[in-house]
Amino acid sequence: MNTNDNRLKAHKLIDHIFQDLLPAHGMAQRPEQIQLSHRMLDAMQDGRIALCDAGTGIGKTYAYLAAATAASAFPTGQIARPIIISTSSIALQNAVLTEYLPLLSCVLMADGILTKPLKAVIRKGKSHYVC
């Protein structure tokens, strides 16, 4: 599979997630969220850093998780790289791990896109532990 084929497939997956799968589970379509996810995917595929700004309620978390999933499912480089996400709060870190990823995994597995749940780990600095 060549790089351009994988780029196209990854972008189609984002559209499928936001236009078909998530709405089937009661979530609203948000054009800004879809555009944001496509921009993030482009940066991931090109190996660039993306600094994206979006208002409250746009759906940033699902936007970057969908982009990361699409980038991993359809890699454009020779080497698979981990995707690192930095959040604004510990509460959001926990929500990504316990709410967002499980729902996205369930939706993608039900559609046959994934065969096993998405995996993630939380890395915390020493200031988060009693020593």
Regions found by a protein language model. Give the residues of each.
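Generic recognition of stable, solvent-exposed alpha-helical segments in well-folded globular domains
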Residues: 28-35, 60-63, 87, 91, ...
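Walker A (P-loop) phosphate-binding loop of P-loop NTPases
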Residues: 57
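Amphipathic alpha-helical transducer elements in NTP-driven molecular machines
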Residues: 62, 117-120
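Conserved Walker A/P-loop ATP-binding site and its immediately adjacent core
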Residues: 80-105, 119-131
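A short alpha->loop->secondary-structure connector
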Residues: 103-115
